[in-house]
Amino acid sequence: MAEFDRDLDDELEFKTSKDVDVTPTFESMDLKDDLLRGIYAYGFEAPSAIQSRAITQIIKGRDTIAQAQSGTGKTATFSISMLEVIDTKHRETQAMVLSPTRELATQIQSVILALGDYMNVQCHACIGGTSLSVDMKKLEAGQQVVSGTPGRCLDMIKKGCLRTKNLKMLILDEADELLNKGFQEQIYDIYRYLPAATQVVVVSATLPHSVLEMTSKFMTDPVRILVKRDELTLEGLKQYFIAVEQEEWKFDTLCDLYDTLTITQAVIFCNTKKKVDWLTQQMKDNNFTVCSMHGDMAQKDRDSIMNEFRSGRSRVLISTDVWARGIDVQQVSLVINYDLPPNRENYIHRIGRSGRFGRKGVAINFATNDDITTLRDIEQYYSTQIDEMPVNVTDMM
């Protein structure tokens, strides 16, 4: 059952365009019957705060900037809107979702297929690290929706396999990351291939001012549904730091923490691939069962690790920020920032992995003497407080 924290919904303050109404039920959104069936079968009962505001605006054809916290149903917001708009009688691609990671693109594909189960919708994950010939075959056969990463989608467009002439909607998920330096040019290149009337939807947990400025280049009079930045700390998440003075002490601190806590599932974040590999080996050498993932791994290995972690066969995942955006594993109760993120926007994406949909979660940050300034900067940016971890932290889990 997919549940949202209703108390959290009530507390959200939307800095929203004036003409945005709240639609309190899915029935009152005037959706297709088969789509409604899919929504209820998926486990949704009533729309979350972002869904009750954004879905009807997107369905009207408005360019939309939607910002909401992790765990409030952003993926379903654009998936439901898109499924309402596409015509399943035609096989050509009518909607494209771009995501910053392969895992997120694949997860979005599975949400779209589940919600569109009774509509017989065709949705393909167009991602790097997979067979080009399979991509080409699937796209040639006709896919109403493509969920992919910018590089592979652009490649397929240039090869003439992903045809955009009938595209109605472009969705940028985790837009802050997509529009950052690494993906900006690819996004602009893709946009040049789209029909002039293509509707653009931008969705993200954080939307820095620079990103909002950038969207003005390819959005027309967008409706804005925004959460004020100081509301972006995640309710129900307890945030702590442990002072470790120097880098060399972090590993012993982690082992001590393991002896103290009973962990359902946890994610440990490091800033580099090298550190992920090193820490994974150290943990295994000390008889801890862990798995790890970073961007250098082959796609089939990353898929296999994600499946293990999602199913609960693996309880601890060590990763770089490749995992930090939008991957929903419902049982994650603890996030450890072995390294504080170098980019403060990524902090909320990392800790947003725990306590999703209103469950309680704990985020623990290892802070060396050199990290204290970064920690205070994160506190100030999100108007939040990160306390030193108490001795009785087990009672908080």
UniProtKB/Swiss-Prot annotation:
GO cellular component, one term: FAL1-SGD1 complex
Source superkingdom: Eukaryota
GO biological process: maturation of SSU-rRNA from tricistronic rRNA transcript (SSU-rRNA, 5.8S rRNA, LSU-rRNA); mRNA splicing, via spliceosome
Segments carrying motif DEAD box: 173-176
Entry EC no(s): 3.6.4.13
Gene3D superfamilies associated with the record: P-loop containing nucleotide triphosphate hydrolases
Main localization, broad class: nucleus
KW Phosphoprotein (keyword) present: no
InterPro entries hit by this protein: DEAD/DEAH_box_helicase_dom (IPR011545), Helicase_ATP-bd (IPR014001), Helicase_C-like (IPR001650), P-loop_NTPase (IPR027417), RNA-helicase_DEAD-box_CS (IPR000629), RNA_helicase_DEAD_Q_motif (IPR014014)
Enzyme type, top EC level: hydrolase
GO MF, one example: ATP binding
A Pfam family per the record: Helicase_C
Claim: Iron is one of the keywords in the record: no
Alphabetical UniProt keywords: ATP-binding, Helicase, Hydrolase, Nucleotide-binding, Nucleus, Ribosome biogenesis, RNA-binding, rRNA processing
Helicase ATP-binding domain segment(s): 55-225
Coiled coil: none
Protein's cellular compartments: Nucleus, Nucleolus
Residue intervals of the Helicase C-terminal domain: 236-397
Catalytic activity: ATP + H2O = ADP + phosphate + H(+)
Binding site for ATP: A68, Q69, S70, G71, T72, G73, K74, T75
Motif (Q motif) on chain: 24-52
Protein family (similarity comment): Belongs to the DEAD box helicase family. DDX48/FAL1 subfamily.
Domain notes: The Q motif is unique to and characteristic of the DEAD box family of RNA helicases and controls ATP binding and hydrolysis.
Protein task: ATP-dependent RNA helicase involved in 40S ribosomal subunit biogenesis. Required for the processing and cleavage of 35S pre-rRNA at sites A0, A1, and A2, leading to mature 18S rRNA.
Protein name: ATP-dependent RNA helicase FAL1
Species of origin: Yarrowia lipolytica (strain CLIB 122 / E 150) (Yeast)
